[in-house]
């Protein structure tokens, strides 16, 4: 605030004393003035071309400073505010200015969109004909379970027991399946965006890196599922900084009533039980239950943190390993697996408590991506693009 006031005073002073300070023309020649303007903007034109030539969101290799500043260290997850502070405001501006969100499809027109709209409107009318309940009549809890993916699906992994028996049992009785994640070992916010808003990342330009910073600010209308709920009944819970991935800005624009986090928001988490390198899933669930009101239909967007890397746990009698893995890789694997077992137990307790509440409640539970502990050889493919590396 002080800097804004100071800047205004400087501008006013320059305007007020302009005739005394600037007597006559500093550069009398029009040609020289035009040349100076061109020289000022010439470097920016080169920078603009450099940013425009990015591939898959990465600056072309060999560009001094920029490749080290952006490609080597991934800072997008820290949000626009931190990016501007660490990489400069102009860096963020140029990146946003040159990021093309989506390529215009062939035969794109209002008429073609109207045709699609009417087709699916009629289909929706048919599907909803005999449905008596509206989604806003119940409470919906989206649980993004950090890095949750069954290790037994990785070929060659040996486990002394099933570490997620409750989750696997629930999958047999309720709607379930495998989800394709866009990321491997990361990309949480992108999966969060897609589940909330329903816009698949594969329809967007490959230069898009983080949906919350590259796409979200450009949306004139945000078709979030939370729109079906009153603003006062929208909650986000994440036991990390609210500023990560610009979540504070995102959930504010989505008109969420409260964002329960560690910092960056007035609504601080009340329950914090340490686990591994972060906080337990039990802590996350307890904070959800703290705000759950049976008298209201609420929407919760919940992101856990327990299973985020690095992974620390006491495996006890649990034995998990894969032949060909290094000692450190197997160490991470068994610790991660033990944390999954804790997730399974805490999720079971959470669902049991929800079942005792006199209110229709639906829980959408999913893992955002595989943990980044597996080497490429684990997928029997040449790279991490193998489908098995992206199924949770």
Set out the residue ranges of the language-model regions.
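N-terminal secretory/membrane-targeting segments
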Residues: 1-137, 158-178, 215-219, 223, ...
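Solvent-exposed soluble domains appended to multi-pass membrane proteins
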Residues: 125-135, 144-145, 150-391
